[in-house]
Amino acid sequence: MNLHEYQAKALLKKYGVSVQEGILARSAEEAVAAFEQLGGKFAVIKAQVHAGGRGKAGGVKVVKSKEEAADYANQLIGTNLVTYQTDANGQPVNSVLVCEDVYPVERELYLGAVVDRSSRRVTFMASTEGGVEIEKVAEETPEKIIKVEVDPLVGLQPFQAREVAFALGLKDKQIGQFVKLMAGAYQAFVENDFALFEINPLSVRENGDILAVDAKIGIDSNALYRLPEIAASRDKSQENERELKASEFELNYVALEGNIGCMVNGAGLAMATMDIIKLYGGQPANFLDVGGGATKERVIEAFKLILADTSVQGVLINIFGGIVRCDMIAEAIIAAVQEVNVTVPVVVRLEGNNAELGAKILDESGLKLTSANGLSDAAEKIVAAVKG
């Protein structure tokens, strides 16, 4: 689950992180009121969407009057913002953040953190190259990225934060400010189950103060049950409609750009299924894992999700019966096909627990379902059916 910039800044501020002040506005009138509250001279208006690249897409602008503030807010609110991180439809702009103008600044830095799977620790990354995508820095000048692994038994130590501050070229009071900021960010990361954290840019102002001008936070969705306050702030309008529906039925669904829908039980088998579809010249339309303990109802909902994607021209169902029985899956497939009125080709591969009974149920259903004898056979058949 991602947070908006205004939500991320508010959360970090609770942990002592100095952030650029801003006021949320959901209308042009509120934007004008916010502009005047911030001094009425200069302000920065930022579209609140779950996507990077807002500045280049016209989602960030400096305004110098209340008329400009109203005009720009009107241009953004109620529209979709398309950036390099969104699809062609973009993300809906329901609000804007009217921020204090902190420019000019002396320098722009970068500070971020993730859970590093290889070291199994929270790893901080910092760079003198703030204001640009960290992926670009990693590709072109990786030597400019400073990394610090945090031992979970003792947490972030002050000396580690000081070492990063020195490496960033900070001096005097800036070092103390940075140590406080990094310590607060780590505490926020751990206590709120962050999956991702970024301050980009972390600006050094002309008076020497350090300030988080932008903030990005991703929360581990598996931890939302113990973060009720954060879960309540979830903006579902920013999420893929099918992925959101899938989460309600505990289905792991990720929309892709192909035309062959996939329904599989098990993440590893799902990835292998997508790979073999591509091997035979097809393009998967989704990743969908119904889980090891799939129920009949969940399978029906999974089928509905796949077919809700208008780009789907065929469906491959690949089930290995371990905990879940293949005959139950077969009954669910039949119920779904009858309920949804499927018009695209459907290829089914069943293996394992009650696979023969499942195949028999499908064969006797009278529906246009093609059975497959193996994974390669299934992929070959669905690709051929879609290509016609």
From Swiss-Prot:
ATP binds at K46, G53, R54, G55, E100, Y103, E108. Keywords: ATP-binding, Ligase, Magnesium, Metal-binding, Nucleotide-binding, Tricarboxylic acid cycle. Pathway: Carbohydrate metabolism; tricarboxylic acid cycle; succinate from succinyl-CoA (ligase route): step 1/1. Its cofactor is Mg(2+). SUPFAM superfamilies: Glutathione synthetase ATP-binding domain-like (SSF56059), Succinyl-CoA synthetase domains (SSF52210). Pfam families: ATP-grasp_2, Ligase_CoA. It catalyses: succinate + ATP + CoA = succinyl-CoA + ADP + phosphate; GTP + succinate + CoA = succinyl-CoA + GDP + phosphate. Substrate binds at N265, G322, I323, V324. GO terms for cellular component: cytosol; succinate-CoA ligase complex. Residues 9-245 form the ATP-grasp domain. GO terms for molecular function: ATP binding; magnesium ion binding; succinate-CoA ligase (ADP-forming) activity; succinate-CoA ligase (GDP-forming) activity. Mg(2+) binds at N200, D214. The keyword Transferase does not apply. It is an enzyme of class 6 (ligase). Its EC number is 6.2.1.5. Heterotetramer of two alpha and two beta subunits. Belongs to the succinate/malate CoA ligase beta subunit family. This is Succinate--CoA ligase [ADP-forming] subunit beta. The lineage of its organism: Bacteria, Pseudomonadati, Pseudomonadota, Gammaproteobacteria, Moraxellales.
